[in-house]
Structures are given as C-alpha cells and as structure tokens.
C-alpha cells in the first residue's frame, strides 16, 4: 500500500463535514489531515456517531439509579435485577438503510443490536421491533413493509433469538422515511460484565468474525446523517447498506461468550457504524490509551480495497477484542472451534494515538489522537423554536360538527381502526428458549427470568414493552412523550410488572430546522418528567435525525423500550378467554390534578380534547387539536395499583386505554377474550358527543376484567391508594355493545364474530401477498 497524500480542504464537504469542523480538525492535529484521516473524522463526527446536535439535550435525562450497573455511553445499558443477575438492554435505529434496501436494512439492524448486547457479556434472549411504514395501500410502502418484516424474521429466526414484542404502525408521515427501531435484551451473571475499553498497554487487538468488504462504507454519513431528496437514486446509496449473515453472527455469539466466560478478554467492541475506526478509537479513548492498527492484517473479502475503505467499512458480524498476548492462542482456539476467523490486527499503546499502519511496523498512514475522534466531536446548540402555527393548531377541536354522529358511523370508525398486529409477529419465532409466558399481541411481553449460570427459573418474570405515538408528539412533543412513557409503564402493569428502566430511540427530522430541535428538546423534557415520576432511569438510547425527504420532516417519534420485574410469577397473568359474567371496570386517577405537566387543569365540565387521537388523524384527517392533560402522580399510582392487583388475582385481565380510546380498547378485549360485552361509559365532559367519549385518549386509564365477587374489594383497595374503580358493564353474549352512561341505546352495536373477523383480517389483507421467508 502507498502513503496517502495530504488533502485539499474541499474534500471535507463531500464527506459531510462543515468548514468550521474541518478547521477544528486542523487545530487538533496542528496540520492538515490526509485523505484517510479526514475520512476517519468524517465518520466519527457524523450525526450518527457523535450525537453532535442532541448531546447537550440528552444530558438532562435521568440516568442514575441503584439498579444501574452501566448507563449511557457504552454498547448497552446494564441493570441489576437481583440474585446476581444483570439484564443488558439496547435500542437502535436502522431507518435510512431500510428505506433503501428494506430486507438487508432491517436484517442488519437486528445483527447490530445483538452484538451490542453480547459485547457486554450478556447472552441475547429477546428482540423487540417497533416498526413504522407508509400507507400500505401504496405499492412502495407495501414493498418496504414486506422487506422489513422479512429481514427481521429472516435474521432473528436464523440467529436463534426470539422477537417477542413490537409495534407496527402505518401512516403517511413515514411514506418516504420508514422507521425500523430494534431493541434487544440479554442476561448474564453480574460478574461477567465486560466493557468496551482497552486499558492494558501491550494488549493485542484481535479482529473476529466476517471478512471486511465494501458494503456499508460511509453508512453513518451517507445514510444516517442526511435526508432523502429528489434526484438521488436509491441505487446510488445502496452500497452504503450492509449485508448480514445470521449464521456467522450465531457462531460469533457463541465464541465471544465462551471466551468471556473463560476470562480471556479484557475489553470487546462490535464493529458497527464507522467500522474499525470507531471500534479502535472508542476502546482506546475509553481506556485512556492508544492503538496501532495494521490494515494489511485485516481479512478482506474483496480485492483492491484501500485503507480508507478498510477503516470505514461497516461489514457486519465483526468484533474487536482486547486480549493479553498470553491469551491470544486460547482465543484463536475457541474461534477455530466455532469456525470464526480471528486475526491480530493491532496493539494497545500508551501514548493516546490511533495509528494506522501499512504493515505491523510499516509506514504510518494516519496518526490521530484517539480521544479527538471519540470525545472531541463538536457539540451544537442549534436554534430552537416552536412551529409558528402551534398555538392556532391547539385551538382546533377535531370533534367540531361531530355532535350528531350516528351509531352506524361510530361503529364504522371503530372497525376501521381495529387491527391485530399479531399477524406480523407470527412471522417471527417468539417461543425460542421456552421463556415466553405472555407473548406478542398483548400489552407487554412477559418472560421467565432464569439464572444465567444454571438456566433454572428464578420464579420471577421479566416484562418488556415498546411504545411510541407520533400523533401525541406531533400535537405536543413534551406532553406526548410523557404520555408514551406512562403508557409503557401501564403496559407492564397489565402483566403484573413494576417498571425498572428504559432505553429510548428518538426519531426526528432535520436538526437544522429550529422546529425539529424544539421538538427534540421538548421530548427530552417530557421523558425526564415522566421517568422522574416513575422513579426509573434511562440507561441508553439512540437518536436518529434527518428523517426527512424533500424538506418534509416526519412527525416526531420517540420510542421507548421499558423493562419491569414481576416479583412472583406463579401464574400466567393473561387468560386465554374471558368468562361470561366477568365484570368490566375502569381503573384511573379520579381526575387530572392541577399543577402537573405542561398546563393547568381544565374545569371538569370542559370536554377532554381529541387532539393527537387516532380517531382525529385517521377518521377526520385532522392533525390539529390539543392533547389531554396528564396527571403524572395519578397515572403512576394507577400503574402501581394495577400491577399489584394483577399479581394478587383481583384482576383477571388488564388492558391499557391508549390508541383509539376506550371504545377501541373494549373491542380489543372482546376480540382477545372471545366474549361480547354490554358497557356504559361515563361521558368525558358535559354534553360530550359519542366520538369524544369513545375515542378520546386521556392517559392513565386501564380496563380490567374482574370476577363479580371481587369488584367491591378491588374498589376498596383502589380507593385507599387514590385510584378510582368504575364499573362499566359485563362480558358475555355475542355482541359488542358500547354506549354512554345516561344516553339511550348503544353508540356501537356489532356482532362479536364480525368484530373478530375484522380484527384478525385487517393487517393480512393490507399486504399484497405472503411474506417471503415467513416462519410457519
């Protein structure tokens, strides 16, 4: 290989760097960078790797708690769940690659998140996939959706990790910018925790896994740190999408865990965004050391690759292990047994420099202080302002003119919103390891928590929920995000679990737009307030910006993955069916208290707003309107009470009220439980029309199926903790009948069989055909 000549300052623009950033690089180096050095800075200072637009805002999130072993900044968050057991959790986005190449974009998102988990020393036990695509009646959106689902199932099923929970949302805001967020969980003994650090000078850097190719070069800057515009062909960006091999990943998982169990590795890092540049600089910077990398030692799958390509390739299924010289032979032996390639490509130095060499002692091709790549990326305080029309939008009432909606129209609106997402999750194997107690399709998933040393059940459960709501956050990013966090906690409560920690994926548009930065800042404040109210930390996350096409940004879409613990898992907290005669009750705080998040309490006679509701967006095509006020203390008290009531068997079946309001939630309970219902709902405000009572989405409400003999006791216990218990009706019969208290007749009166048919068939019928590679 030949030396790289110094660059002219114009090349930095093509690599995604600004003029001030280029000047800062020259200051840090006290010279001009050469081509290779400039490329390394470009990928590490990209939005995807550096969080340069969001870092100062993310610092406001609560990240500390007694359970936190590892918080943000490492490959994954790690929390102590007791008994010497730790859970690693992480969420990432693969939005831009999935818009270009849906199958590989989604598949490699799965592979990347799994490496983040076992890098910490944890065995991956579960995946979660909150997905968002454009309208399914449009061919391109349908093609993207099929490719994404196929990619996740093809990789996850093959690598042997179950996909246990997720979301599937179709909306026009994601027409050109689908969101593929993927979360993963792993379990390990607390003593096996390993960090991505190179602390011991003289240790060797061992590259393990797949060979290095040209796939994914520049992915963090070409795709993840820029939007899409007309005139840019997808094919031009397709080489920046990585290609995955789940069978290579499976072998890599087993090899890495075996060497970690044997104590042969002092630090380990996956090669994700920015490839070897990121892995080498991050491990060195975190460890306060330096590293020399020999690019001629890197196994290549394509001929003629140059140092720039080798150092920035994002080829999948690769890990960089920090190994003392005396342990290298044992590491190689383990890798050979698992048919994993292992090659020494560098060594740890004590001078803090990252050097790229042509040969172990050959010419220096790049010489950069490692910390400047990892720690010295710029941090921007970008301008922020709310949209100019925000105040006017909040004054709109989507229900205007809906006072005389007929029962037939109410029923039609409900059926149009009714769709069981379980069809998507049946493409995935969610029963691997036989740990799944409550599977996908319910409010949360519940897993048996096993001792990672012996594999024996602990008698406790690990609950997982994923939630996001772009409609709420478009109406009010701060309050909407707080509602999302509370909904996630409510979902855990519905399976009897108390929240422990969360990770977030913040999906937004172009950060150079002040309105987008305002949305992001408000989102972080809302998440902070809700987490503080729940008493839980944020232990990691991801920020995906530049989700825009032709200057049009997606609706702000923060997504959370929350975990909780069920302390005594002695029964399955979700029945297979609802028994006729079971009572339907509503559990919630008595009313929204004054002085809580984002605004004063409206008088009780005022109608609950319909802004941000699914009914307003999908049935009235109205994105305007105010959100309901959220009573954080009341919602937290309700979640805690519901979790305890489920565990104590006072509640047989619980379901939170969120998308689609209480009308849709009741219909979903009927469909899942196979029972009709006769229910009367208290009006939400004086003279509230049917659509407001049925479809408004005030947070902090849970529906519960209760045995008749337990209702009075449930009400007494609820009252003692400030939660109201309202009897709404009774399950049974062959019709779904929902009306307003004090009003004659029913606003919704549907045959149960027709309702179930719509619920089960809506999503499969939206796809053009069977999904390739779907699980049987």
Give the predicted meaning of each segment.
Residues 74-340, 349-353, 357, 380, ...:
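Mobile "lid/hinge" segments at catalytic clefts and subdomain interfaces of large enzymes
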Residues 3-4, 9-80:
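N-terminal amphipathic, basic-rich helices that act as targeting or association modules
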Residues 45, 49, 58-108, 112-114, ...:
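Non-catalytic terminal/interface segments that mediate subunit docking, oligomerization
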Residues 3-15, 19-21, 27-38, 176-178, ...:
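Glycine-/charge-enriched secondary-structure boundary and capping motifs
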Residues 149, 194-196, 421-424, 693-695:
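Short histidine-centered beta-strand/loop micro-motifs
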């Amino acid at each position: 290989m030949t030396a790289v000549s110094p660059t002219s300052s114009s090349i930095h623009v093509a690599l995604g760097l600004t003029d001030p950033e280029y000047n800062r690089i020259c200051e840090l180096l006290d010279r001009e960078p050469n081509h290779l050095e400039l490329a390394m800075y470009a990928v590490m200072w990209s939005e995807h790797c550096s969080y340069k637009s969001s870092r100062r805002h993310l610092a406001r999130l609560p990240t500390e708690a007694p359970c936190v072993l590892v918080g943000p900044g490492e490959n994954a968050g790690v929390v102590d769940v007791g008994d010497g057991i730790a859970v690693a959790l992480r969420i990432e986005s693969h939005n831009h690659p999935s818009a270009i190449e849906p199958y590989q974009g989604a598949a490699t998102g799965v592979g990347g998140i799994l490496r983040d988990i076992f890098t910490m020393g944890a065995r991956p036990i579960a995946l979660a996939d909150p997905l968002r695509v454009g309208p399914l009646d449009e061919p391109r959106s349908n093609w993207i959706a099929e490719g994404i689902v196929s990619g996740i199932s093809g990789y996850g099923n093959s690598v042997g990790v179950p996909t246990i929970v997720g979301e599937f949302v179709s909306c026009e805001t994601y027409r050109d910018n689908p969101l593929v967020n993927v979360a993963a969980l792993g379990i390990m003994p607390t003593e096996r925790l390993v960090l991505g650090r190179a602390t011991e000078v003289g240790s060797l850097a061992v590259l393990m896994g797949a060979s290095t190719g040209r796939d994914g070069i520049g992915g963090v800057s070409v795709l993840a740190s820029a939007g899409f515009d007309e005139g840019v062909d997808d094919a031009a960006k397709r080489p920046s999408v990585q290609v995955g091999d789940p069978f290579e990943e499976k072998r890599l998982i087993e090899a890495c865990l075996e060497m970690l169990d044997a104590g042969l590795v002092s630090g380990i890092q996956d090669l994700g965004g920015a490839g070897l540049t990121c892995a080498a600089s991050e491990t060195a910077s975190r460890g306060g050391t330096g590293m020399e990398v020999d690019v001629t030692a890197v196994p290549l799958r394509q001929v003629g690759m140059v140092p720039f390509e080798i150092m920035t390739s994002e080829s999948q299924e690769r890990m960089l292990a920090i190994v003392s010289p005396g342990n290298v032979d044992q590491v190689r032996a383990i890798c050979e047994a698992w048919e994993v390639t292992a090659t020494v490509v560098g060594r740890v130095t004590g001078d803090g420099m990252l050097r790229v060499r042509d040969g172990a002692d050959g010419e220096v091709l790049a010489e950069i202080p490692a910390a400047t790549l990892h720690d010295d990326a710029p941090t921007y305080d970008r301008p922020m302002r709310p949209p100019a029309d925000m105040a006017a939008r909040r004054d709109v009432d989507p229900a205007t003119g809906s006072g005389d909606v007929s029962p037939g129209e109410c029923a039609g609106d409900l059926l149009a919103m009714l769709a069981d997402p379980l069809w998507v999750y049946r493409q995935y194997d969610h029963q691997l390891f036989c740990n799944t107690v409550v599977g996908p399709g319910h409010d949360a998933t519940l897993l048996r928590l096993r001792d990672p040393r012996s594999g024996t059940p602990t008698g406790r459960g690990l609950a997982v929920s994923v939630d996001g709501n772009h409609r709420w956050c478009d109406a009010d990013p701060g309050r909407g995000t707080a509602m999302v966090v509370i909904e996630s906690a409510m979902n855990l409560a519905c399976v009897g679990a108390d929240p422990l920690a969360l990770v977030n994926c913040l999906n937004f548009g172009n950060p150079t737009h002040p309105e987008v930065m305002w949305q992001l800042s408000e989102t972080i404040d809302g998440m902070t307030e809700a987490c503080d109210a729940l008493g839980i930390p944020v232990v990691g996350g991801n920020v995906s910006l530049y989700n825009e096409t032709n200057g049009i940004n997606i609706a702000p879409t923060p997504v959370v993955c929350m975990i909780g613990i069920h302390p005594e898992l002695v029964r399955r907290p979700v029945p297979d069916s609802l028994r006729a005669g079971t009572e339907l009750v509503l559990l919630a705080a008595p009313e929204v208290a004054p002085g809580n998040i984002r605004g004063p309490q409206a008088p009780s006679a005022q109608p609950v707003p319909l802004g941000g509701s699914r009914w307003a967006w999908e049935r009235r095509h109205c994105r305007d309107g105010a959100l309901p006020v959220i009573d954080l203390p009341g919602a937290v008290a309700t979640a805690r009470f519901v979790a305890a009531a489920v565990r104590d068997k006072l509640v047989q079946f619980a379901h939170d009220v969120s998308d689609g309001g209480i009308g849709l939630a009741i219909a979903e309970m009927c469909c899942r439980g196979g029972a009709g219902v006769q229910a009367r709902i208290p009006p939400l405000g004086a003279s509230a029309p049917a659509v407001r009572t049925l479809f408004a989405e005030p947070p902090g409400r849970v529906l519960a199926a209760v045995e008749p003999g337990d209702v009075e006791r449930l009400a007494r216990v609820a009252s003692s903790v400030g939660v109201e218990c309202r009897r709404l009706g009774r399950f049974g019969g062959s019709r779904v009948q929902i009306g307003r208290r004090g009003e004659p007749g029913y606003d919704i009166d549907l045959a149960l069989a027709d309702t179930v048919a719509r619920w089960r068939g809506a999503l499969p019928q939206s796809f053009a055909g069977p999904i390739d590679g779907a699980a049987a």
